[in-house]
A protein has these predicted regions:
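Conserved C-lobe terminal segment of protein kinase catalytic domains
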Residues: 69, 194-196, 208
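Transmembrane beta-strand segments that form the barrel wall of outer-membrane beta-barrel proteins
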Residues: 199-209, 230
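Exposed, low-structure sequence patches enriched in small/polar residues
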Residues: 182, 188-192, 202
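Repeated loop/turn-to-beta-strand initiation elements of outer-membrane beta-barrel proteins
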Residues: 57-60, 117, 196-199
């Protein structure tokens, strides 16, 4: 459990391991206390639906749902964690945000005739929008802050184990943003005979933003099926 020892030449505690020059292995207690990732996640969901009966067997339903997720991931690697690459400590901070909005409008019709024939039809449309963004910030502490003969700052961190962006000259930032929209119309119908024979027909057409500015901006896919209940 004695995972760190004091280094008088650097005036900090460093990794206590049999071979500090290797990168593959570390003292497990050091990893637990000085290389431990921390993450936080929040998720929110809101939704609702409204249904209206127009007449017997015919109804209209509208639904709306919104979801949002926020996640933060931090990893602070103390000085001497990785041989040759962590002289003063490295800071990694990642933040991810995502949200989704979905809504649809459905018309449903159900009818039975003399317990012999049945018909069930659903038709409608839907809208879906997804959006995600991420920001990753890495402060490399692989070298001491220095200035070359020309007076130009080269790289490095100012002080060891100070995990703040202001402590690092060498910062790496990566930002991503993605957004997608999907609009759809669809219909499905089921014909039944004496509750033993069923024929299903469905069709759907989607318009996706991922296909924008292409020849095939939408795609259509129908289906037909049948089923028989032998005991009927």
């Amino acid at each position: 459990s004695n995972y760190e020892v004091y280094d008088g030449t650097r005036n900090i505690n460093v990794h206590n391991w049999t071979n500090t020059a290797q990168e593959q292995f570390s003292n497990p207690y050091w990893m637990l206390n000085r290389q431990k990732p921390v993450s936080y996640r929040n998720r929110y969901e809101f939704g609702g639906s409204v249904k209206y009966d127009i007449m017997e067997g015919l109804s209209v339903t509208g639904r709306l749902r919104y979801e949002r997720g926020d996640e933060t991931w931090n990893l602070n690697e103390y000085a001497s964690s990785t041989a040759g690459r962590n002289l003063l400590g490295t800071m990694k901070d990642t933040r991810v945000n995502s949200e989704q909005t979905y809504g649809d409008l459905l018309a449903q019709y159900n009818k039975t005739w003399e317990d012999t024939y049945s018909l069930s039809v659903t038709a409608g449309g839907s809208y879906q929008k997804t959006k995600s963004s991420s920001l990753e910030l890495i402060g490399w502490g692989d070298s001491q802050f220095s200035v070359n003969d020309a007076g130009v700052i080269t790289s490095g961190a100012y002080y060891p184990n100070i995990f703040s962006p202001a402590n690092y000259y060498k910062l790496q930032t990566t930002k991503t943003l993605a957004e997608k929209r999907l609009n759809s119309v669809f219909a499905t119908a089921q014909f039944g005979y004496k509750e033993g024979l069923f024929i299903d027909v469905s069709a759907r057409n989607d318009w996706s933003s991922t296909l924008a500015f292409t020849d095939g901006v939408s795609f259509f896919y129908p289906s037909v099926g049948a089923s028989v209940l032998l005991d009927r």
